[in-house]
């Protein structure tokens, strides 16, 4: 195969944005093991920085405040994204991939999926440029994103979107205004499959709510641009399961709302809790109070909507 004799050692970078689920309705388990979802995603401005430099060797590095527990190996989903792009370009999957983790790991904010989406974009741009290849089309990148995981297509797209199927079938949604979130992270993560399994158990025992698949209230609230209206529409079918597995999250939610948040929800499968606030000052008060009253928590203030994976 033809390729330049000496590809450059240029460093390429992309931002990988976190997400919050404004609505997460979970249907019954399908034959393939996945659950049918009706979810409304919104991208947040908190982001990881994913870097790639071509090399004949393979190196995966993880740095940053939330690096703990993230595999610095070729098992990392972001490296799998590099491999998929390299295969499409008929190139060897080698190089140095680095993730600076600012998104909590195993926190229900799609940090791993966001890194994979950024790696898709990054590898496509870097490798096609370095080796003078026709880049993978945008349509094909979306297909690769879906192959990698349910949240990867949205973290590639960004903005605000309705997700159906596993969450990978996306429709962009109108969203007026800017929404401010107080995000509370936890040192101990929650496994997404474990939370879904717990929801199935609760429903089988008659203790889980029926699937809430209607997203109209959230859609209308987003069009209004009123954070109070959006707060009233926030919903997560997985929240009872997450609270059953981690009762300590209930105190976090209660503390945040008592401190002035319009509404607090478990983000995705948890354990991260997201509090919608009327303004940044209130968000700062919420994170200060929650962290003071709950050991082992960390915090950040984020806004949405934000872009998807972005080259820098």
Language-model segments: which ranges?
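Solvent-exposed alpha-helices and their adjacent loops that cap or buttress functional pockets
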Residues: 4-6, 42-43, 146-147, 153-156, ...
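Conserved hydrophobic/aromatic beta-strand scaffold that supports enzyme active sites
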Residues: 13, 49-51, 160-162, 181-183, ...
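Glycine/serine-rich anion-binding loops at beta->alpha junctions
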Residues: 71, 98-127, 150, 261-277
């Amino acid at each position: 195969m033809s390729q330049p004799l000496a590809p450059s050692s240029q460093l390429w970078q992309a931002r990988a944005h976190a997400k919050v689920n404004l609505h997460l309705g979970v249907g019954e388990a399908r034959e393939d093991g996945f659950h049918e979802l009706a979810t409304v995603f919104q991208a947040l401005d908190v982001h990881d920085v994913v870097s790639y430099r071509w090399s004949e060797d393979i190196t995966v590095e993880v740095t940053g405040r939330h690096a703990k527990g993230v595999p610095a190996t070729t098992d990392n989903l972001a490296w799998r994204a590099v491999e998929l792009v390299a295969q499409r370009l008929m190139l060897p999957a080698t190089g140095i991939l680095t993730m600076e983790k600012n998104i909590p790991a195993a926190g229900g904010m799609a940090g791993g999926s966001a890194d994979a989406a950024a790696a898709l974009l990054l590898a496509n741009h870097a490798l096609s440029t370095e080796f003078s290849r026709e880049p993978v089309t945008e349509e094909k990148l979306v297909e690769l994103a879906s192959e990698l995981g349910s949240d990867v297509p949205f973290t590639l797209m960004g903005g605000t979107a309705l997700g159906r199927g596993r969450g990978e079938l996306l429709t962009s949604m109108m969203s007026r205004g800017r929404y401010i979130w107080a995000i509370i992270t936890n040192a101990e993560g929650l496994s997404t499959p474990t939370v879904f399994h717990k929801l199935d158990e609760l429903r089988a025992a008659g203790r889980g709510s029926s699937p809430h698949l209607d997203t109209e209230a959230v859609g209308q609230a987003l069009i209004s641009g009123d954070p109070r209206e959006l707060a009233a529409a926030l919903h997560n079918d997985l929240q009872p399961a997450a609270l059953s597995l981690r009762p300590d999250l209930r105190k976090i939610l209660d503390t945040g709302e008592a401190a002035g948040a319009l509404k607090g929800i478990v983000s995705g499968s948890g354990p991260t809790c997201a509090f919608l606030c009327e303004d940044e000052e209130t968000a700062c008060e919420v994170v200060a109070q929650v962290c003071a009253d709950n050991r082992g928590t960390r915090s950040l203030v984020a806004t949405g909507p934000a872009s998807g994976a972005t080259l820098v």
